[in-house]
């Protein structure tokens, strides 16, 4: 019974702490996300969603991720 109460209090405390510490940053993060999405709507060719392969020097797992088709930990 005591352990259950301690766990419940700990979860409530951590939840409250998360909301208190994240509140000032979360609104700014959403604003930056909105501005980036708005920029991509105005310039669709600049959108990262259109990129289907990685440029040389970018880390990779398989060769089919790289534009060149060659991957040795980084795109060649």
From Swiss-Prot:
Expressed by the venom duct. Disulfide bonds join 53-67, 60-71, 66-75. Residues 23-52 form a propeptide. It comes from the Eukaryota. Omega-conotoxins act at presynaptic membranes, they bind and block voltage-gated calcium channels (Cav). Belongs to the conotoxin O1 superfamily. Residues 1-22 form the signal peptide. Keywords: Calcium channel impairing toxin, Cleavage on pair of basic residues, Disulfide bond, Ion channel impairing toxin, Knottin, Neurotoxin, Presynaptic neurotoxin, Secreted, Signal, Toxin, Voltage-gated calcium channel impairing toxin. GO terms for molecular function: calcium channel regulator activity; ion channel inhibitor activity; toxin activity. Its main location: secreted. It is found in: Secreted. GO terms for cellular component: extracellular region; host cell presynaptic membrane. The keyword Disulfide bond applies. It comes from Conus textile. Pfam families: Conotoxin (PF02950). This is Omega-conotoxin-like TxO2. The lineage of its organism: Eukaryota, Metazoa, Spiralia, Lophotrochozoa, Mollusca. The presence of a 'disulfide through disulfide knot' structurally defines this protein as a knottin. The cysteine framework is VI/VII (C-C-CC-C-C).
């Amino acid at each position: 019974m005591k352990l259950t109460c301690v766990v419940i209090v700990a979860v409530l405390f951590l939840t409250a702490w998360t909301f208190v510490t994240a509140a000032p940053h979360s609104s700014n993060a959403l604003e930056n996300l909105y501005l980036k999405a708005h920029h991509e709507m105005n310039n669709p060719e600049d959108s990262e969603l259109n990129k289907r392969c990685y440029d040389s020097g970018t880390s990779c797992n398989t060769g089919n991720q790289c534009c060149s088709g060659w991957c040795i930990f980084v795109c060649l």
